[in-house]
Swiss-Prot record:
PANTHER family, per the entry: PHOSPHATIDYLGLYCEROL--PROLIPOPROTEIN DIACYLGLYCERYL TRANSFERASE (PTHR30589:SF0), PROLIPOPROTEIN DIACYLGLYCERYL TRANSFERASE (PTHR30589)
Pfam families: LGT (PF01790)
Disulfide cysteine pairs (residue numbers): none
Positions with biased composition (Low complexity): 299-330
Places the protein is found: Cell membrane
GO molecular function: phosphatidylglycerol-prolipoprotein diacylglyceryl transferase activity
Keyword Amino-acid biosynthesis in record: no
Major enzyme class: transferase
List of residues binding a 1,2-diacyl-sn-glycero-3-phospho-(1'-sn-glycerol): R144
Name of this protein: Phosphatidylglycerol--prolipoprotein diacylglyceryl transferase
Family statement drawn from the similarity comment of this UniProt entry: Belongs to the Lgt family.
Length: 427
């Protein structure tokens, strides 16, 4: 009874078949961990000032690179299993769904993919890593459940009350082996071991909570939160490696992952101390896509239409004035030298008009005489103008007499002046 309450068993199998398609627990937990990391990372990225959805775009680079890097690290540190005497061969080396991912390779090559994605979006890689750090450690915790279903990465034999029972499994060919990934448990216990997968799972959950707390209290940025995650994970991984008893590469009697954890921990601590304090400017997290789209916002169709309408309203009086000036010039050549039609009474304009009239009065002399004949009050002015124009007398005498001899000119000026004022008032 005490044994049943103390030890906990391994799952009876780690793979199920949906027809010809195998459904592996290890792959399901890896996918679940990736989804959880992306969901948490996206929310954290938006909370820091970034644009929502960018995490998923960069994940298209990060996840494939991370999976390949994790597999390469596993093959490099456990090469005898595949290419040593009696090794599984190249076919087993590429079957990533059978298990075997090294977190250090996944983080290293995944960082390369993240750098490519961040560069394409114009956002800083350290800020992206800070937003994703808690999600990564949570994904690692979820992924350890896949090791539990595969009966792998366990520790040395133990008599502790929380020991893990490893069962013999029979594969479809009838071969019985506790390491069979496709087999089903026979119910016979092969050994009781340290549940190192559980130790690392609990440690990762503790780091996950610690990262969230530190990020809120200390406002870590510029990659410092990610460095804290790496340093914290290295401590736990170093301790777990001391308890593991599975096949691994050793250097001077020490597992290679222990060396890796030590060096990576030192690098993380150095970066944590050297990186800038505080957080990035939220505007720097928007990326180049947001900046490129921003100038288009203040130029909607309504603003353009309003600008055009205002331009037309201002240009209409000017156009009307230009058209009026053109018509008047075509009809009266002598008025081409009159720039201001609204001020016929000013002395300066009258002097300018009189100066220009002698040059253009010869063709219009009869026109000025026709309307003057029925008028009884202006014969003297007409007769006085003719000798003045012909003899070229001084313009002083014409200043006072100019409005009277040609009644058509002031009428035309008033007409165009009134029309111009109406258009300007309509503006």
């Amino acid at each position: 009874m005490t044994k049943l309450l103390a030890y906990f068993p391994s799952p009876p199998q780690g793979v199920w078949h949906l027809g010809p398609v195998p459904i592996r627990a290890y792959a399901l937990f890896i996918i679940a961990g990736i989804v959880a990391a992306l969901l948490i990372g996206d929310r954290r990225w938006e909370a820091r000032g970034g644009e929502r959805g960018v995490i998923y775009d960069i994940a298209l680079w990060t996840v494939p690179f991370g999976l390949v890097g994790g597999r390469l690290y596993h093959l490099a540190t456990d090469w005898r299993t595949y290419w040593g005497p009696g090794g599984a061969g190249f076919g087993a080396a590429v079957r990533i769904w059978d298990g075997g991912l090294g977190i250090w390779g996944a983080v290293a090559l995944g960082a390369v993919g993240a750098w490519i994605g961040c560069r394409r979006h114009g956002i800083p890689l350290p800020a992206f890593a800070d937003a994703l750090a808690p999600g990564i450690i949570l994904a690692q915790a979820i992924g350890r459940l896949g090791n539990y279903f595969n009966q792998e990465l366990y520790g040395r034999e133990t008599t502790l009350p929380w020991g893990l029972e490893i069962f013999y499994r029979r594969d479809p060919s009838g071969y019985i082996d506790p390491h069979s990934l496709d087999g089903v448990s026979t119910g016979q216990v092969a050994l009781v071991v340290q549940p190192t997968f559980l130790y690392e799972l609990l440690w990762n959950l503790l780091i996950f909570v610690a990262l969230l707390y530190a990020d809120r209290r200390l406002t870590l940025g510029h990659g410092r939160l990610f460095a804290l995650y790496v340093a914290g994970y290295c401590v736990g991984r170093f301790c777990v490696e001391l308890l593991r008893d599975d096949t691994a590469t050793h250097i001077a009697g020490i597992r290679i992952n222990s060396f890796t954890s030590t060096f990576v921990f030192i690098g993380a601590v150095v970066y944590l101390m050297a990186a800038p304090k505080g957080r990035e400017d939220p505007e720097s997290l928007r990326g180049n896509q947001y900046v490129e789209e921003e100038p288009a916002e203040p130029e909607p169709a309504t603003v353009a239409a309003t600008t055009e309408a205002a331009t037309e309203g201002v240009a209409a009086p000017a156009d009307g004035a230009e058209a009026a000036g053109a018509d008047a010039t075509a009809q009266r050549p002598e008025e081409s030298a009159e720039p201001d039609v609204e001020k016929p009474e000013s002395e300066e304009t009258e002097a300018a008009e009189e100066a220009s009239e002698p040059e253009a009065e010869e063709p219009e002399a009869p026109e000025a005489e026709e309307p003057e004949e029925p008028e009884t009050e202006e014969p003297e002015a007409d007769s006085g103008e003719e000798p003045e124009e012909e003899s070229g007398e001084a313009p002083e005498q014409l200043v006072a007499e100019e409005p009277e001899p040609a009644p058509q000119q002031p009428e035309t000026k008033r007409r165009w002046g009134a029309r111009l004022r109406e258009r300007l008032s309509g503006r």
